[in-house]
Curated annotation (Swiss-Prot):
Belongs to the NAD-dependent DNA ligase family. LigB subfamily. It catalyses: NAD(+) + (deoxyribonucleotide)n-3'-hydroxyl + 5'-phospho-(deoxyribonucleotide)m = (deoxyribonucleotide)n+m + AMP + beta-nicotinamide D-nucleotide. SMART domains: LIGANc. InterPro entries: DNA_ligase, DNA_ligase_AS, DNA_ligase_B, DNAligase_adenylation, DNAligase_N, NA-bd_OB-fold, NAD_dep_DNA_ligaseB, NAD_DNA_ligase_OB. Its EC number is 6.5.1.2. It is an enzyme of class 6 (ligase). The active site is at residue 128. It comes from the Bacteria. Keywords: DNA damage, DNA repair, DNA replication, Ligase, NAD. The gene is ligB. GO terms for biological process: DNA repair; DNA replication. Catalyzes the formation of phosphodiester linkages between 5'-phosphoryl and 3'-hydroxyl groups in double-stranded DNA using NAD as a coenzyme and as the energy source for the reaction. This is DNA ligase B. GO terms for molecular function: DNA ligase (NAD+) activity.
Length: 562
């Protein structure tokens, strides 16, 4: 969690180009409400910090924590601009850095990136490895201390743990008497693809290991990437060569000169999509020329910026909870979200599932949820990561009001299920009526022309023509399409009305009349493919339901009984 290991910047320069769902617009809260929300979120973050520091593990995904911490500071900027959420340090082991750790401004707007590169000479690009920052201090070639980033000025003493990491040398030759290096401790991965796998909480694994009282085998899985050498060689090639000689060759392998935004974009894309030995959360652009280390501060550096990747988990505010009823009476719940970007997709809705699932999630407007992309790029609700302090309850539909035999007739309450029945009826699984889809059914419903799912059979061309915006030709075509249903066999009508016979058993309806179907037993139905005991009972219940019996009688009166 980056605020625990690096400096927080209350001003996010350049924005994040839609990647984060943390909005820059201040909420419409009074002072009382804003204080409640800020205090509650601060307390939640502090609780997570306690777990992080005492147990060495993260209760939430790293990128989720980062976004909520960013949200807190955004609220502070709106309502308490004199306050900044400070970085907490543990109560033990505070140690000063010989050279301060700077922060990184974050840019993602193309024009700003182009301008930043154009205004500088000798620019290089590196992956922004997602680990924990550390200072290494060598005295006369001997590793004397290792300090976590902390607040950029002081951090925890990690010396003993760092000495147990195989990749970090204890002794160096041909180096200055005082050598200060800053870098990233990271969890070594095999063929990690950031755009597919995300952060996998690798940062928390490393941080947890560094805070364990007793070392574990995880130490052997930790690597180090040096990204700063205060007061080091003046040119980047010389710097990289010296680091390689010291044993830090990875820096040279993943540091490349760039001359344009196109060069930066190429590496940004390549490292996001191709396998790497570490987790990344973006790239870092840096110029070789840097001030002397004594002038560094724990604020944003002028000589380097970060161009981040979109978080694998996006935190979004819930705007509304939408309930829908399907043809069979199944209730589904969808969350409307503040528009966010997941990879290259704009997302404003995420499916929750059933009504009972929504109740389990306990999510309401104003809450924050974590969303990611599942298979085939479908948005997935991962978790409710923050609940607002003032939550207005929502009255949801009753599951008892909707079922397989509800809403064959129109009413205000039944509008969704009734429309779904008509869409199924006119679709490819039913009567396949040309030009009659949900929009047409909705217009007929709004004009009061549909009392039940068969009312349309008796509509005249004149009635259709009277529908607003229909027109003579359109009315004629729709009338012709509706009347074509009279030529359909009874088996198609039964399927259109919702008879729950699977496709694999449709042949069961061939050459069998209505009375015979009603008298079939469960055993007879179960002889067909895809029909088990439960499905057979559902079919029999459908065929004997009073509403269905009435509809079949009406069809018979219309001459549809084959």
């Amino acid at each position: 969690m980056w605020l625990r290991v690096c400096t927080f910047l209350i001003i996010i320069v350049g924005g994040i180009s839609g990647f984060s769902a943390v909005a820059g617009v201040c909420p419409d809260w009074d002072n009382t409400r804003s204080k409640k929300e800020i205090d509650a979120l601060r307390q939640q973050l502090e609780q997570w910090d306690d777990v992080y520091y005492t147990e060495g593990k993260s209760p939430v995904a790293d990128d989720v924590y980062d976004q909520l911490r960013e949200q807190l500071n955004q609220w502070l900027g709106c309502f308490q601009p004199q306050s900044v959420a400070s970085v907490r340090l543990p109560d033990h082991g505070k140690q000063l850095h010989p050279v301060a750790h700077t922060g990184l401004k974050k840019l993602s707007d193309r024009e700003q990136l182009v301008q930043w590169i154009a205004q500088r000479e000798d620019v290089w690009i590196q992956p922004k490895i997602d680990g924990v920052a550390v200072t290494l201090v060598y005295q006369h070639g001997k590793l004397e201390s290792a300090v976590s980033r902390g607040n950029g000025l002081q951090g925890e003493d990690w010396t003993e743990k760092v000495r147990l990491i195989p990749e970090i040398p204890h002794l160096l030759t041909n180096v200055p008497s005082l050598l200060v290096l800053q870098g990233e401790l990271f969890l070594k991965m095999t063929d990690h693809r950031q755009h597919i796998q995300g952060g996998v909480n690798a940062r928390s694994v490393v941080a947890g290991e560094m805070r364990r009282h007793q070392p574990s085998p995880v130490l052997s899985q930790i690597g180090l990437f040096i990204w700063e050498w205060p007061d080091g060689p003046k040119t980047m090639p010389e710097r990289l060569e010296k680091l390689t000689e010291m044993g830090f060759a990875m820096t040279a392998d993943y540091t490349h000169a760039i001359g344009s935004f196109a060069d930066a974009e190429k590496w940004h894309h390549y490292w996001y999509h191709n396998p790497l030995p570490f987790v990344t959360d973006g790239v870092v652009l840096r110029q070789t020329k840097e001030p002397q280390g004594r002038y560094w501060r724990n604020t944003s550096a002028d000589w380097a910026i970060a161009w981040k990747y979109p978080p694998f988990h996006q935190v979004a505010e819930v705007i509304d909870v939408v309930f829908s009823v399907g043809r069979t009476g199944k209730l589904a719940v969808v969350l409307k979200l503040n528009l966010l970007k997941l990879d290259d997709k704009s997302v404003s809705r995420v499916n929750v599932g059933s009504l009972s699932r929504w109740k389990q999630w306990d999510v309401l407007p104003g809450d924050r949820v974590s969303v990611s992309l599942a298979g085939q790029g479908i948005p997935r609700l991962d978790n409710v990561v923050w609940r607002s302090t003032e939550r207005l309850p929502i009255v949801s539909p009753s599951e008892h009001d909707f079922h397989a035999f509800s809403c064959f007739r129109y009413s205000t309450v039944c509008q969704q299920q009734f429309l779904a029945r008509l869409v199924w009826l006119s679709g490819e699984h039913g009567l396949n009526l040309t030009g009659v889809r949900d929009g047409m059914w909705l217009r007929l419903m709004q004009h009061g022309l549909l009392e039940d799912v068969l009312s349309w059979l008796s509509l005249t061309e004149a009635q259709l023509n009277a529908v607003t915006g229909m027109g003579d030709k359109r009315a004629r075509d729709i009338y012709k399409s509706l009347q074509s249903a009279r030529q359909m066999p009874l088996s198609r009508w039964l399927l259109a009305l919702g008879l729950p016979v699977p496709r694999s058993a449709i042949s069961a309806l061939n050459h069998v009349n209505w009375l015979a179907l009603q008298q079939w037993t469960a055993q007879q139905w179960r002889q067909f493919s895809g029909i088990g005991e439960r499905r057979a009972e559902e079919i029999m219940a459908f065929l004997k339901h009073p509403a269905v019996v009435e509809f079949i009688a009406r069809l018979d009166a219309e001459g549809i009984h084959r």
